[in-house]
Amino acid sequence: QVHSFSLVGQDGDRVTEASLSNRPYVANFFFTECTGICPTLRTRLTAVQKAFDSDDLTMLSVSIADQDQDLSKLKAYSKVNGIQSEMWKLVTGDSNAIQHFALDSFGARLDLNGNLYAHTETVYLVDAHGFIRGLYNGTLEVEIMQLLNDLQILVSENLDVT
C-alpha cells in the first residue's frame, strides 16, 4: 500500500495520498531532462491521459531530480508536452521525501552508491484505496494496452461504489 506522502505539484498545489484517494491513479518516476526512457514513457502515458476523464483518474509523475524542484521547470515541461495539470500531476519535493516515498511505497531500490534507483520504465497502477494493483513496462505499447484495460476495470469498480 502507498504510504502517506506530501509533495508539490507543477501548479504549486500540495499533493498527498489523501488528495489522491477515492479514485485510481497511475504513478511513475521521471526527470524533465531525461533523454533516455522518459520521452517514450511520456508518449505512452499521454495515451492514458486521453483515454480517461480527470474525474475518473489521476496520473502522478514524481521527479527524482533536484533541478526539478523549481516548479517553473515542471510547469514548462507540462505545457510543452500537453500535460493536463488537472489530471496529470508532475510532483517534486525534497530529496529525502522523494526517496522515502519511492522506497516505502513503491519498493524502489538504491544503487551501489546509495542513490535512489527509481527512474525505470515501471508504471504503477494504484486503486482508490491506495493499494498497488499492477506494474507495467511503460515503454511497451502492449503493456500500456493492458494498463488501459485494467484501469477501465478499476474505474468501473470505483463508479459502482461511489
Language-model segments: residues:
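Short active-site neighborhood of thiol/selenol oxidoreductases, capturing the structured segment around
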Residues: 15-45, 60
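Thiol-/selenol-based redox modules, centered on thioredoxin-like
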Residues: 113-162
